[in-house]
UniProtKB/Swiss-Prot annotation:
Keyword Zinc-finger: yes
UniProt organism field: Oryza sativa subsp. japonica
Zn finger spans (RING-type): 832-871
Disulfide cysteine pairs (residue numbers): none
Name of the protein in its database record: E3 ubiquitin-protein ligase BRE1-like 1
Gene Ontology annotations for the cellular component aspect, listed alphabetically: HULC complex; nucleus
Amino acid sequence: MGSTGEPDRKRRLSSSVAPGGGAPVSPAKRLAVAPTSEDKKLDFTVLKYKNQKLSEQLEAHKFEYRALENKFAGLKEKQRTHNETLSLVNSSWEQLVADLKSRSFCKSGSPNSSPGSGHNNVQKDGTCAPIERDTLRSLVESGATESSGCLPGCHLGSDAPPLHLSTANALGDIFFPSSDLLQANEECALAALTKLPENDRSKQLQSTSSNLLSSLNNVVQALSNLQLKHKQLAEDYQNQRDSSARKRAEHRRLKEELASAASELEETNYKLAALKAQRDNTQGARIPYPTLGNKNMPEDKVRDKQREMQDLEATHKELSELISKRLVEIKRLHEERIEILNKIATFQNILMDFKSIRSSKAFQLVNDRLQKSQAELDHYQTLLEKLQVDKDKFVWQERQFNLKVDLAEIPERVSTYCESSIADLKKDIQKLCDEKNMLILKLEEASREPGRNQVITKFKALVSSIPREMGAMQSEMTKHKEASLELNSLRAEVHSLSRILSRKERDNEEASCRSARAGSDITQLQSVISDLKQTNKELKLFADMYKRESTDSREIMESRDREFLEWAHVHALKSSLDESKLEQRVKAANEAEAITQQRLATAEAEIAESGQKLGTSRKDLVSLSHMLKSKQEECEAYRVEVECIGQAYEDIQAQNQQLLQQIIERDDDNTKIFMEGVKAKQTQDALHLETYSLRRNLQQESSLMDLYNQKIVSLEDQLKMWSDRVGKLQEDGWQQSVSLSNYQRKLVDVHRDAQKLMQSLDGIQANVGSSRLEVADLLIELEKERFSKKRIEDDLEVMSRKASSLRAKARESAVLEKLRHEVKEYRGILKCGICHDRQKEVVITKCYHLFCNQCIQKSLGNRQRRCPSCSLSFGANDVKPIYI
């Protein structure tokens, strides 16, 4: 408060008062005065003035100290309530962490499993996947646990890392398995839904699953919103802590300044008492003064006394006239000051009238633009939400397509099995052809050889076995035909899937066009915001120009400058508030646009990959169709060959019948024995072939059964998990609906409270305007009372002077000489130390030397403004008028 420079000022004053007070005086006007008494009186008056100033500063410091104490008590009360709420929040947070741990134990299966044991985010190839872990760490460190250790008087120290670690572990147990489970459940649900028959129950199950997924997404969004609100509250609390620390530091600084001011005041009081005692001692001694003429002659003394009395009367008249002029001038200045105070009060009321500000054209224009921009932002947000919904639908359909492709692999396996069986049949046919050729050769040899009866019997047995083999081959051919029909159905299904994929590609292109339109709209909104900022800058420039155009007096200019500064501050606050809101909305829109563009890019990449996969699947399908055609042609060729063999067999059978008729009678016994051996051999070979084929078929069927059993078990497990998940989601949805209704009721209450607060704000503003008018009236009355008090004091001083002059006339000559000496001393004090003619009218506040106004104005006109007594530099603001 400027207390450090007071001793220097006292030293300068004590060193500079002597030359100013001891300046030479004209002998024609006044007598010489001792410099020591003048210096002492100047020191006394200056110290008295300083003492008064310091007492005023001390009172102001005391008032500020009381206000700060009240404020500090209020802050302590707020801190106490805040500590209570914070302790409650900490307890609830610990309870939440415990609940999370219990839920994580339930999800992991055993309480001994740690979060890092099952979810360490390490892949099979050794690479880490730290995305979810980083997200969890940011959630725990910045948002959730930020309010758990921010008490001003307590620091957690070593307790904070275990709390963070436990929270991170609990959240890891909740989130990391849930993400894997969600992904696995989605895949299983898609597989189960695609395999369900198309009836009312399956459609109802699909609708309920989609509703549950949407409610789950809403719950996740609500959790993210709660985390953001928690983070904002933690930031607000940190700001309150910083402000309270700053206020405590200011409180300590003001205490120190108050103590220093009190010590300085005591020092000045001590010096003032010493100077008073010294003055009382000096006033008791008489000071001889020279007189004009001869001292020994009494007539000269009488004449001198009369002349001095006349001079005293003349000076008294001059002083009375000067006092009357000064009083008139003071009255005029007082009236001007009252008028200025009235104008300032009216200007303050105009500036703080919020209704007039709201009704202004500029405010209405800015408000309309803000409403338009808000509507456009809402429109763009709806467009972005629609794009997000379309993208989610596309992802869902793409997953369905992938599931259908996976299901299409099963007919491919069946076709490969059919091809392997066809190859086996070809081998069997080839063996039969070879056996046929061998039989023909044996028949020819038997016809040539004498033991043809045995050959004939063998041939009969073979002929009897050929029809059975032909029936088996025909059954296998029918099976192959059925497999070819299934392949045609699979082709039709692949064709339908390709058409669905092309349709989805067209939908994706339309979505990209919509996103491009949304980006152009966002750029237009940004240009509108830049125009608003430019108009705000122009308005500020107009305000500055209007500020510079004023040509009134200095005091009016200062008041207008203060008015314009307050007005600019109000507008700056409003514009900063509006711009911050706009910037937040634009940032949110830009972030949403960037997210949609990223998602669109990923969707396009996935579409390109699916297109490539579809192309490869089409190529594979074409190659398989060509292979099937070739196999069908080979089957037709085999069929023709079998028919040819049958016809040849019929011809041979006719010939054999003729031959048999010739040799039946001779070779009956031999044929019976040979037929029995051939039958036994044929049955043995047939049994071997049947056992081999049955074993091979049994192995293939067992492998297929194992595969289907595994799929059935996995689907049953997934169905159980999904049923449990559906129950949990239904419970969560019910809880969320209850909480949503509660939040809606709270929102309605908040809106009602806001309306009441606005109404109370209008009433308070009206009361503030009336109170300002009352304060202005009180200030005017106070100025009037001060002026009247000053007039009374001046009148009292004049009357005291008159009484002293009357007493001086009635006293003896010694008293008259003493009065004359005192009058001369006062003249020396009142007259200027430069011109020694005019009265002292102004004071330099840096060194407290008194001079007349004209001499000081001359020194102010110079480039180097220095005090004539102590050569201390000063400015125009350091010169203050005084009334003596």
